[in-house]
Structures are given as C-alpha cells and as structure tokens.
Amino acid sequence: MKIAVSYLSIKDNIKEELSKIDKLNIDYIHVDVMDGVFVTNKTMDYLEESSILKDTTHKKDIHLMVEDIKEYVDMYSNLNPEYITIHYEASKDILGDINYIKNKGIKVGLSIKPNTSVDKIIPYLKNIDLVLVMSVEPGRGGQAFIESSKEKVEELYKLQHSYNYVIEVDGGINNETIKKIKEANISVVGSYITNGEYESKINSLKEGEK
C-alpha cells in the first residue's frame, strides 16, 4: 500500500516540517484544499500554499473540498499534481469536471463522504483514476476512523477488476486502522504522523498493513 502524508495537521513551522516529511519513504504529499463553503474550515490561500509545496520532491495528491471546482483546478493544476480529486457531493456537473481535469493532463479522483454510498459513483468509475473514501467527515484532521468505511473499501475492491481506478482512504488512519483497509491502494495519514517521530510512525504503518 502506498502512503500519502497530509500536512494539514502541522500547526507550526510548516515549511520546515514538510522538508522533514519530504525525506521519508512515502509516495505522495496529500494536499487538502478547503474553501470554507463546502466544508466549514478554510485552508491557506493558493499563493501561500504553492510557495510551501514548490520544493517538495514527492508527487502531489490534491484533494479539493470546494464548491467552485474549476477555479481551484485552474490554480492547483500549476503544481503539476499526479491526482486532483473532487467531491461527488460538491460537483454540479461531475462528468464535465472530470473531463476538465483530464484535459489538463492530470489524473482524476472522485471522493465520497461517509454518508454517501458507493452506488452513487458507479456510473463514473469508468471515467476516473482514483476513488477517495473519506473515513471521517471532511474538513478537519484528528478525527476517529468511521468503521463503515471498511465495507466501502471492500465493495470498491470487488468492483476494481472491471475498471482502472485505485482506492484511497483518508481519515483516522493509524497503525491499527490501516489493518482494516488492506484492500486499499493508498492510505492518507495526517495527525498520526505529525504528532510523533515521523520515521518511526511510517515504519509502524508499514508493519500494520502486513
């Protein structure tokens, strides 16, 4: 399983701490983008965030928790991410938004909140590269893993052979909960990493998924 580290939970010295995370044996930097509308919290503005992220050597995985999707896609596509993920619940034109991202040469993810069933996104699975299962309510870090997320991952895993997407899980991931999502391809970790010794925490995650 690949590891994406979200730096949303870093409170101080973000650039310095991100440079430490950048040296870890991980696969992605997960970038949470919040507009204060789709979710109540709001992240820093694009110019500030891009100045922090420009030096990272890891691939970027952008998670848009926003309503004005195209506006944010235009901004964050300049960071050359591997994925830009939008929310099923936020988009008013899902296929249009998917194609808008694809036309920029970027892989597309579609995310579902804890109360949204997998059935809702089945019509779009053939068009996307990633499904992001939110295992907490989106908008803030440090929440506990929602157990029903395990069933969603299992359902998406059974469907996966018919499509070309990877499964990503975000929220409440630690060395115990990672055992519940072994069918996932990418796990997003935040406060579990940033609240401790980075390298030992990554190692414990890799042990946990075995």
Segments predicted by a language model, with ranges:
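Hydrophobic faces of well-ordered beta-strands that scaffold small-molecule active sites
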Residues: 3-6, 29-31, 60-64, 82-86, ...
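Catalytic cores of alpha/beta
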Residues: 14-21, 68-78, 116-127, 171-187
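Surface-exposed amphipathic alpha-helices with a cationic face
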Residues: 22, 50-54, 77, 96-105, ...
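N-terminal active-site wall of soluble small-molecule enzyme domains
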Residues: 30-100
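Glycine/Thr-rich beta-alpha phosphate-binding loop at enzyme active sites
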Residues: 36-47, 114, 122-154, 158-161, ...
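Glycine-rich phosphate-binding active-site loops on the catalytic face of alpha/beta enzymes
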Residues: 84-92, 132-142, 184-202
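C-terminal alpha-helical cap/extension of soluble enzyme domains
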Residues: 168-210
